[in-house]
């Protein structure tokens, strides 16, 4: 989950004011995803990525995986204060919600402008990256 892209979209398209990581829509998104998957016992790894500062990372302490740049990692390593876990797996596991139909899924995606735009952009970028990789591999043979 590229939380920076979520934040950037909100800053460019809304009048959202961010006082700290708890107000960051990207941090809130990773937190919601983590809590949903753990509460329903989905067997997957939730990984947050694309951080700008240590506060965003600290707000997601306890997430299954975080990709952290070397600069931010050095800053975190130099800070000897306690880092309390912020994301804690659910103790009470709930039955998974019923699966959405394709139509319900598409409607839910279309109800959120940020999701609609960023999902489409992400798919296009991954497809372009795959094509470039395939061309590189083909050129080597």
List the predicted regions and their residue ranges.
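Short, small-residue-biased leader/transition segments that mark boundaries at the very start
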Residues: 1-2, 126
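Catalytic alpha/beta core domains of metabolic enzymes, predominantly
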Residues: 3-91
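C-terminal extensions of enzymes
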Residues: 87-141
